[in-house]
């Protein structure tokens, strides 16, 4: 992946930092609606931007291969899917412990790896 974006990073950049280590040539970006969280991440060298997934600045996401979110509120998942569809990016969700809200959403692939459950919406499946 050339460009990866975490939506709703908050104050937990651990996955993003690990990705940056594992994929040093990829552009890794964090977004959040909280300007204070974004400022704190910027101070530790994380490329981060204030953005609201309900009114996304699509220029931020252009060219992204993957957009992911860890334990997002269920109401933003359809917004992530819509954004991914518009810009041509895969969407990866690591859900809260309860993942029942995916039962009403179509096209998502459920993946279980070492006990971790993730949902993937591939751009090729839309």
Positions of predicted regions on the chain:
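Conserved class I S-adenosyl-L-methionine
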Residues: 2-12
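Conserved SAM-binding loop of SAM-dependent methyltransferases across substrates and taxa
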Residues: 11-24
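Conserved SAM-binding strand-loop segment of SAM-dependent methyltransferases
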Residues: 44-56
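Conserved SAM-binding motif I beta-strand of class I
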Residues: 27-32
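Conserved SAM-binding loop
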Residues: 41
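Conserved SAM/SAH-binding beta-strand->alpha-helix loop
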Residues: 34-36
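C-terminal substrate-binding/active-site "lid" region of AdoMet-derived donor-dependent transferases
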Residues: 75-126
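A short acidic, Gly/Pro-enriched loop at the edge of an enzyme's catalytic core
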Residues: 58-66
């Amino acid at each position: 992946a050339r460009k990866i974006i975490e939506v709703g990073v908050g104050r937990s950049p651990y996955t993003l930092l690990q990705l940056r280590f594992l994929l040093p040539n990829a552009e890794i970006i964090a977004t959040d609606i909280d300007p204070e969280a974004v400022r704190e991440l910027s101070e530790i060298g994380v490329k981060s931007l204030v953005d609201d997934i309900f009114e996304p600045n699509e220029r931020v996401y252009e060219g992204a291969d993957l957009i992911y979110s860890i334990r997002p509120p269920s109401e933003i998942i359809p917004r992530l899917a819509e954004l991914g569809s518009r810009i041509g990016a895969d969407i990866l969700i690591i859900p809260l412990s309860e993942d029942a809200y995916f039962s009403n959403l179509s096209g998502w692939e459920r993946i279980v790896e070492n006990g971790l459950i993730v949902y993937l919406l591939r751009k090729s499946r839309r």
